[in-house]
Amino acid sequence: MADLLLGVNIDHIATLRNARGTIYPDPVQAAFIAEQAGADGITVHLREDRRHITDRDVRILRQTIQTRMNLEMAVTDEMVDIACDIKPHFCCLVPEKRQEVTTEGGLDVAGQVDKMTLAVGRLADVGILVSLFIDADFRQIDAAVAAGAPYIEIHTGAYADASTVLERQAELMRIAKAATYAAGKGLKVNAGHGLTYHNVQPIAALPEMHELNIGHAIIGQAVMTGLAAAVTDMKVLMREARR
């Protein structure tokens, strides 16, 4: 079985920065640290409202990321234009609503095949590999094939949010069947959304999975595992100032 890749989403480094309108913490530095720690790629979502990652972030990250850059974006002319200019290695096309806290579901590719085909084609023409963020649904998988996308990313939110063991097992089975179906259609299969240190392994064990994109859980864990060192460093500086 091939190695499973990890794409680290660093959006919430930018969320923390923007909460105070400062220049830190820096997503560019976070990307470097993640890569040094073994991340196989860096994912950022340039939202239409620019609530976390900014255009400037995207441009600098494209120049500095040493692995692979995956740009998540809505299917709009503006975003496709930006992607065609910056040329990330990958683009993941996602649905987007201004009021949502995070992406709430998969793209309805089947309901807008012509629009998706046009976007996928424009991105592919400049050498960008395209993934479509969809629910674990055979109809959407068929539509992704029709649109010409080489990759899909299966939305794992329902699996992550399941409130009982039986619900989670049912969602896992749905994802597993979708992954097998998609791989049989020649698609590369990624997955993401809501994956944590407690629920990732059953998804990671699915043999068709090529890459998992995980962000919030990793950034949250980083706060916890790095908090002691950060407090110690600050205390050292304060003590040194009084010497």
UniProtKB/Swiss-Prot annotation:
Question: So where does 1-deoxy-D-xylulose 5-phosphate get bound?
Answer: 11-12, 47, 52, 102
Location of the active site = 45 (proton acceptor), 72 (proton acceptor), 193 (proton donor)
Against InterPro entries, the record matches this protein to: Aldolase_TIM (IPR013785), PyrdxlP_synth_PdxJ (IPR004569), Pyridoxine-5'_phos_synth (IPR036130)
Q: Name one GO molecular function term.
A: pyridoxine 5'-phosphate synthase activity
Give yes or no: UniProt keyword Cytoplasm. Answer: yes
Which positions in this protein are listed as binding 3-amino-2-oxopropyl phosphate?
A: 9, 20, 194, 215-216
* Location within or outside the cell: Cytoplasm
Q: Name one GO cellular component term.
A: cytosol
Which UniProt keywords are present, listed alphabetically?
A: Cytoplasm, Pyridoxine biosynthesis, Transferase
Any one GO BP annotation for this protein: pyridoxine biosynthetic process
Q: Which reaction does it catalyse?
A: 3-amino-2-oxopropyl phosphate + 1-deoxy-D-xylulose 5-phosphate = pyridoxine 5'-phosphate + phosphate + 2 H2O + H(+)
Highest taxon in the source lineage: Bacteria
Q: Which CDD domains match?
A: PNPsynthase (cd00003)
* Biochemical pathway: Cofactor biosynthesis; pyridoxine 5'-phosphate biosynthesis; pyridoxine 5'-phosphate from D-erythrose 4-phosphate: step 5/5
Family indicated by similarity: Belongs to the PNP synthase family.
What does this chain do? Catalyzes the complicated ring closure reaction between the two acyclic compounds 1-deoxy-D-xylulose-5-phosphate (DXP) and 3-amino-2-oxopropyl phosphate (1-amino-acetone-3-phosphate or AAP) to form pyridoxine 5'-phosphate (PNP) and inorganic phosphate.
Q: What is this protein called?
A: Pyridoxine 5'-phosphate synthase
